[in-house]
Amino acid sequence: IKVFSGQGYKLSDSVEARIEEKILSQEPMKLRTRGEIGRRHHGMRQLKRDYIDFVASTIESDLAGLKILADCANGAASATAPELFGRFKARTDFIHRDPDGVNINSHCGSTHLEDLAAAVVRGGYDIGVAFDGDADRCLLVDETGGVIDGDKVLAVCALDMKRRGKLNGNTIVATVMSNLGLHEFCRNEGIDLVCTAVGDRNVLEEMLRHDYRIGGEQSGHTIFTDVETTGDGEVTALQFLQVLARSG
């Protein structure tokens, strides 16, 4: 289970520790009544539409000319990615988009890129996009089947942001697990790299502390604070694809 604040951010370690302390305490807790808790929104179809509208609005490109293959990991993206990518002019095909409650992440998605890489090469696609089961992560493969991990996503998107004057603080936030290649890339491109402890929450806290705009992990959690409050695989995919379309 993931709990978010009213501002859309993951809870800090200190807040989670206080909640855990309360739960484990033997002292009786005063429980709030229904009227004090708030209201539940149950419009699932509207929520799905709102989500797709939002993600589509995060880029300006129509992605025309791209041939994309997306792996939905038999998970959350299966319900949203086809309609989302259908909003753009790219040709997009999908694999592993038939969840049955058991096959999520099973030999597919961002943790198993073999099927996607082979299918991209076989089908002559420009790019392959892979989500994980809950679609908060995104990795990609190029036209040769080569893996584009989270560090490479950070590098490509940050360089594009720098060239457009959008890289606030001239900084990428990554973790101590980042590849040395990312460090070398940043040195060569004159970009500052700040590394945090492992975990996208640590990355986000550092980004918010200094108003940095891009950060993430090698595993595919990427955060663009210009458009979101947490990592989202479908947002990441569109941000990367927009750079690809823009570069021709």
Each language-model region and where it sits:
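Gly/Ser/Thr-enriched, mixed-charge loops and adjacent short helices
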Residues: 2-123
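Short hydrophobic/aromatic-enriched beta-strand-loop microsegments
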Residues: 89-96, 147-152, 190-198
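Active-site flanking residues adjacent to catalytic metal/cofactor-binding acidic residues
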Residues: 70-73, 131-133, 216
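Glycine- and other small-residue-rich loops at beta-strand/loop junctions that grip anionic moieties
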Residues: 40, 44, 70-73, 105, ...
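Short, charged, surface-exposed secondary-structure boundary motifs
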Residues: 102-107, 159, 203-208
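Phosphate-binding and adjacent anionic-ligand microenvironments
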Residues: 127, 164-248
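Predominant activation on well-ordered alpha-helical scaffold segments within soluble catalytic domains
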Residues: 20, 53-56, 79-86, 114-121, ...
